[in-house]
């Protein structure tokens, strides 16, 4: 019995050593992937171990059977280990392919969800479509074929078929330069209606040729004139601007019209007042502050009394007219006072200072051709006023003192005082 137990014990450690070696290799190669196989095998080992423990004291034949079964299990374990190793080496390759597939699907989703417009998508699709196509675009070869025209070959102009046989081959252009009846010599005279038609065609051909010859020089002349006009545009524009400028109008007529309007307004105001001072001259009123007594006497006397006194003084003393520096040589004295009164008025209007820079007489508004003539008029009339200023006493004061009736009655004014 002791021997059998020893043998069984020696057999059991051998089987256990084999199982431990196989399990150690399995655990080192595939610990994570084949847990289920290990659990299954461990259960079998546990069952087998239980059986060996139960049959520890049984016959040796049964022990041999158990050893054989354990060896078979070990062989199956080694085969399973080899398969697991191959699976471990092949598994990363499969995982990489799976990862690549997943990345490609993610990229496709990203590109689809990106902000691409419809036009860009269409362009991409078109580009992908054209890349697949094989387009061999080449220009077509054109063959230059020289066709011989019938006119050049036969040197006869072909016209429509509505003409009869001899006339459809006639050269109307050649017959147009010759006389209209020259074609009758070449061709038998046909019917009257066809003759009129051919005559009309020849006339039209001739007119067309004449118009072309007439229009050719016109076209050349117009082309040359257009070229010259383009070259001479700046100079012609200057000439046009000079012509467009109107001549300068002298400014003197505007001054004259303004002075005339002012004098008319003053006359209207004086006529509306209705006072006896309306006939008193302006220069007599301007110097009223110098001598009050003389101005009062002038305001009281009327225009008729002044004229009579002036006429009486001129009849008695014809030298009074000589005292005027601007007066013309004295005319011969007459006995009638009617002839003397207008002369006194003319002298007073000429030599006294003018009321306005221009005469009061109405002036026509027509502009003169020579503006220098207008300038001469005020110069001649300014001389009288200048000469009167050169004297010690102005002339209008002398005349006012001498013509007043109160001073004449008192005898204060005399020719010696005036000198």
UniProtKB/Swiss-Prot annotation:
Residues 378-388 have a biased composition (Basic residues). Residues 1-23, 100-119, 234-298, 362-388 are annotated as: Disordered. PANTHER family: PROTEIN FAM217A, SI:CH211-266K22.6. It comes from the Eukaryota. InterPro entries: FAM217. Pfam families: FAM217 (PF15344). Belongs to the FAM217 family. Residues 7-23, 284-298 have a biased composition (Polar residues). This is Protein FAM217A. Signal peptide: none annotated.
């Amino acid at each position: 019995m002791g021997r059998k137990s020893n043998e069984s014990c020696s057999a059991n450690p051998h089987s256990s050593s084999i199982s431990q070696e196989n399990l150690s290799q399995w655990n080192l190669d595939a610990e994570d992937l084949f847990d289920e196989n290990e659990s299954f095998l461990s259960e079998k080992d546990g069952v087998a171990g239980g059986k060996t423990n139960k049959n520890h004291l049984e016959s040796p034949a049964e022990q041999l059977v158990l050893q054989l079964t354990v060896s078979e299990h070990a062989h199956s374990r080694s085969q399973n280990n080899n398969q697991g190793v191959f699976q471990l080496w092949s598994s990363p390759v499969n995982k990489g392919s799976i990862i690549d597939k997943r990345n490609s699907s993610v990229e496709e989703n990203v590109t689809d969800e990106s902000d691409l417009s419809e036009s860009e998508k269409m362009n991409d699709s078109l580009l992908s479509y054209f890349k697949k196509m094989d387009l061999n675009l080449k220009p077509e070869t054109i063959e230059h074929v020289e066709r011989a025209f019938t006119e050049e070959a036969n040197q006869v102009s072909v016209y429509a078929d509505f003409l009869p046989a001899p006339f459809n081959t006639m050269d109307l252009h050649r017959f147009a330069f010759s006389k209209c009846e020259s074609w009758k010599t070449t061709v038998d005279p046909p019917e009257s209606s066809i003759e009129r038609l051919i005559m009309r065609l020849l006339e039209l051909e001739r007119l067309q040729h004449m118009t072309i010859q007439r229009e050719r020089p016109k076209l050349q002349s117009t082309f040359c004139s257009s070229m010259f006009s383009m070259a001479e545009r700046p100079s012609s524009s200057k000439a046009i601007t000079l012509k467009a400028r109107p001549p300068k109008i002298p400014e003197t007529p505007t001054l004259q019209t303004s002075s005339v309007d002012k004098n008319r307004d003053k006359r209207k105001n004086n006529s509306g007042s209705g006072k006896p001072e309306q006939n008193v001259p302006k220069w007599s009123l301007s110097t009223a502050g110098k001598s009050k007594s003389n101005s009062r006497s002038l305001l009281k006397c009327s225009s008729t009394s002044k004229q009579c006194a002036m006429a009486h003084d001129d009849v008695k003393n014809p030298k009074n007219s000589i005292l005027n520096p601007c007066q013309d040589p004295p005319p011969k004295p007459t006995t009638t006072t009617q002839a003397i009164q207008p002369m006194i008025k003319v002298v007073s209007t000429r030599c006294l200072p003018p009321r306005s820079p221009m005469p009061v007489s109405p002036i026509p508004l027509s502009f003169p051709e020579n503006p220098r003539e207008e300038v001469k008029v005020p110069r001649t009339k300014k001389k009288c006023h200048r000469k009167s200023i050169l004297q010690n006493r102005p002339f209008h004061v002398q005349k006012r003192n001498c013509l007043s009736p109160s001073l004449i009655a008192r005898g204060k004014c005399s020719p010696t005082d005036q000198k």
